[in-house]
Design a protein with these regions (language model features):
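Catalytic glycan-binding domains that act on GlcNAc-containing polysaccharides
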Residues: 1-192
Length: 192
């Protein structure tokens, strides 16, 4: 609830970035897979659960990174980690490891296109495949990424992608004292 209170305070011009943008440890590698930088993982956690380890969504997603149990089970197998459903909402490190491994795989699957990976994390890879087909494909220079995001059919996913990218820029500034240039959000190779 600290993030919600910090958001309310910021509306009154009292900024508490320490609470509005919490910082926790994130992995760099999981069983050989390179994981995106902390700023990106923290951006997803902030948007998914506001750092509430016990968060449960109406759809059944669990923990800090709001993993669906079925997805978590598949990712655990890929990451060569044991799958224990109860740990999704009780063990922050476990949840972050699985979620980080999953988002890293999505980024690789989309050749570094963060907007695709973020949208797939929220709505699933099949939806992104469909949206690339009907909205055209920025990787083929058929449309610009900003326009592609605006054409996402689900308001929730469109907003989610925008907020994660926004959070990412804020976290980059907090952690490294430098925001990321907008053009680098949309390049077709991983930032990590």
């Amino acid at each position: 609830f600290a993030i919600q209170i910090a958001k309310i305070a910021s509306y009154e011009k009292r900024f508490h970035n320490k609470y509005n943008y919490p910082i926790i440890s994130t992995p760099k590698y999981i069983n050989g897979r390179k994981i995106p930088e902390s700023a990106f993982i923290l951006s997803i956690i902030r948007q998914e659960s506001e750092f509430d380890i016990s968060a449960n969504s109406h759809a059944g997603a669990k923990g800090l990174m709001q993993l669906m149990p079925y997805t978590a089970k598949l990712v655990a197998k890929q990451a060569k980690l044991p799958y224990v459903k109860s740990r999704l909402t009780t063990d922050p490190e476990y949840n972050i490891n699985l979620g980080s491994h999953y988002i890293a795989g999505l980024i690789l699957n989309y050749d570094g296109a963060y907007p695709y990976a973020i949208a797939a994390y929220n709505a699933g890879p099949n939806r992104v495949k469909y949206w690339k087909k009907i909205n055209k494909d920025p990787q083929k220079k058929q449309i610009d990424y900003v326009d592609w995001i605006e054409l996402i059919k689900f308001k929730e996913t469109r907003n989610y992608v925008q907020r994660v990218l926004e959070n990412y820029n804020v976290y980059r500034y907090i952690l490294e004292q430098r925001p990321i240039e907008m053009k680098n959000f949309f390049r077709d190779n991983p930032l990590f």
